[in-house]
From Swiss-Prot:
CDD domains for the chain: Prefoldin_3 (cd23156)
Quaternary organization: Heterohexamer of two PFD-alpha type and four PFD-beta type subunits.
Keyword flag Chaperone: yes
Keywords: Chaperone
Protein name: Probable prefoldin subunit 3
Purpose of the protein: Binds specifically to cytosolic chaperonin (c-CPN) and transfers target proteins to it. Binds to nascent polypeptide chain and promotes folding in an environment in which there are many competing pathways for nonnative proteins.
GO molecular function per UniProt: tubulin binding
Source organism: Caenorhabditis elegans
GO cellular component, one term: prefoldin complex
UniProt keyword Glycoprotein present: no
Length: 185
């Protein structure tokens, strides 16, 4: 169960090695059956915590992708209106629940929320490039999280198998000791 640097995931999550020979593993790790159960339960809990944290992060990041798609669609519409030299009417928010209509003669620029209460004005092409780049970055993170979640699920399964191996080994050892004691009488 010793973790080495080459047995880590991309995010530094240690690999759980399958325990095939429980007795030699216990000897190597210098653990009793009870101590091994505690160690594996702790490891299992850590894996489950990391899994839930990654799932929450993946959900948050995945929710951003449709927002980028919508913004890109709007910018594409603005670019098309500008190319056709068409004006268009839109409604925009003045304050809570107060909207007004405006006619845009020739769209040239758009303002984009960057976060932390920062809005920046871009020309349409640069805005599209920025949003496309940001969408790609978010998609890359979602893909990485998907891969890491697959890895962590494998580690959880391996840890569960190891836990059952330890429990079964303990049961068999107690049965053997009981049989020896009953045979000695």
């Amino acid at each position: 169960m010793s973790d080495t640097a080459d047995s880590l995931s991309a995010r530094g999550i240690p690999k759980s090695e399958l325990i095939e020979d429980v007795e030699s593993w216990l000897t190597k790790e210098k653990l009793s059956i009870e101590e091994a159960e505690v160690v594996l339960r702790e490891k299992y809990g850590k894996y489950k915590y990391v899994e839930s944290s990654m799932l929450a992060q993946k959900v948050r990041m995945s929710e951003k992708i449709p927002e980028f798609e919508n913004s890109l669609s709007i910018i594409d519409t603005l670019i098309a209106k500008r190319a056709a030299d068409e004006s268009f009417e839109t409604t925009f928010l003045l304050s809570d629940d107060v909207y007004t209509k405006a006619t845009v003669q020739k769209p040239e620029k758009v303002s984009i929320w960057l976060g932390a209460n920062v809005m920046v004005e871009y020309d349409l092409e640069n805005a599209r490039k920025l949003l496309d780049k940001n969408r790609g970055s978010v998609q890359k993170v979602v893909d990485e999280l998907t891969n890491e979640l697959s890895y962590i699920k494998d580690q959880i399964t391996t840890t569960e198998v190891n836990m059952s191996h330890i429990v079964n080994f303990g049961v068999n050892k107690r049965r053997a000791a009981l049989a020896v004691n009953n045979g000695a009488k």
